[in-house]
């Protein structure tokens, strides 16, 4: 019998920073256990996340696809309860969306970028699995982050 259930402990986290460099790379800083950890995002997801995090998505003239998804889910009775960063393979993160409904809950797997955007829009809880947390690199402003600009 496998006795490593602590590897699947959920650790609460939240978005602390969005960093952009001149090479169109983004890094998000997640606050986990009072320390900041850096996770890379592609330029599209980073741009949309910045749009949401800056408040521009609160009253847009055109909704982004993530807003349309949340509106549709709400219209059929689902609410995003939490986002879980649950797996990491190489530099790819897999996240699980937990949607609640009065009759049943459903779960979807998505990319880190989509999960962060949906979490920022819905303001639901966000967690990282301990197994993934142990693979993350601390946000090092003196090291690999020296070429990035902070836009938060």
Where do the language-model regions lie?
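Divalent-cation
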Residues: 2-152
């Amino acid at each position: 019998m496998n006795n490593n259930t602590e590897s699947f402990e959920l650790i609460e986290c939240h978005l602390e920073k969005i960093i952009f460099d001149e090479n169109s790379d983004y890094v998000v800083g997640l606050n986990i256990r009072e320390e900041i950890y850096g996770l890379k995002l592609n330029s599209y997801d980073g741009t949309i996340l910045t749009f949401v995090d800056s408040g521009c998505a609160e009253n847009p003239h055109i909704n982004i696809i993530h807003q349309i998804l949340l509106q549709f889910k709400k219209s059929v009775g689902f609410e995003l309860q939490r986002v879980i960063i649950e797996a990491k393979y190489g530099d790819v993160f897999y996240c699980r969306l937990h949607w609640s409904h009065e009759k049943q809950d459903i779960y979807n797997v998505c990319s880190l970028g989509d999960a962060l955007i949906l979490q920022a829009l819905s303001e639901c809880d966000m967690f990282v699995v301990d197994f993934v947390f142990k693979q993350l690199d601390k946000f090092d402003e003196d090291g690999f982050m020296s070429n990035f600009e902070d836009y938060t």
